Amino acid sequence: RDRYIRTHYGNKMTEEQWKKYATETFTGFDTDETMCRLSCMNLMLHSVTNPQLNKQDSVSKDYMVKDTYDLILANPPFKGTLNKENISESLSAITSTTKTELLFVALFIRLLRVGGRCACIVPDGVLFGSSKAHKNLRKELVENQYLEGVISMPSGVFKPYACLLYTSDA
């Protein structure tokens, strides 16, 4: 990533833009503190001097959305379902479900700025599930967001997962 940006934008970015890139650009969330530390170390090895990685459950009601983002890249965990009383109300407004795969997609919709882009790995069920919650979330993506594409992964890569790409229009 760093090499790509330096190669393609190195002479186009001011010193102030480089400083912002290294100190303010990267934010992440995980419930596992070890994963936060490993991710932080990886980013620092790639010239990101101040990554904002936080240990928190971003779909729980304890998480309050404060910021919105231009770009979201995600491979969230999908552990089945959550207790309804533990789910963030802002996510319940987008999808009425306890399934984590749908809650994370709803979270990404909530976190994107207008015109923002998201690429996330999701189970095939998000695309083909027949429940009311699955259908409503797909309708949200098609009618209120800009769904650029769906990439089906080759067998064994993230089986049975696909990659969902969309841009926020809302």
Functional labels for PLM-detected ranges:
Residues V65-K66, P160-L164:
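Short glycine/proline-enriched turns and hinge-like loops at secondary-structure junctions
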Residues I94:
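Phosphate-binding chemistry for phosphorylated carbohydrates and sugar-nucleotides
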Residues T98-F158, A162:
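Conserved Class I SAM-dependent methyltransferase catalytic core
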